Amino acid sequence: MPNLQTVAQLISLFLILTSGPAIIVLIALRRGNL
């Protein structure tokens, strides 16, 4: 079984990769760049 800290880092990295584009779109919408 892998280390709990390693699992947490993998999950956080996965969340950042999957939610990254959505966050960028939200910031662009707030600034009115779209």
From Swiss-Prot:
The chain crosses the membrane at residues 7-27. Pfam families: PSII_Ycf12. PSII is composed of 1 copy each of membrane proteins PsbA, PsbB, PsbC, PsbD, PsbE, PsbF, PsbH, PsbI, PsbJ, PsbK, PsbL, PsbM, PsbT, PsbX, PsbY, PsbZ, Psb30/Ycf12, peripheral proteins of the oxygen-evolving complex and a large number of cofactors. It forms dimeric complexes. This is Photosystem II reaction center protein Psb30. One of its GO terms (cellular component) is photosystem II. One of its GO terms (biological process) is photosynthesis. NCBIfam families: PRK13686.1.
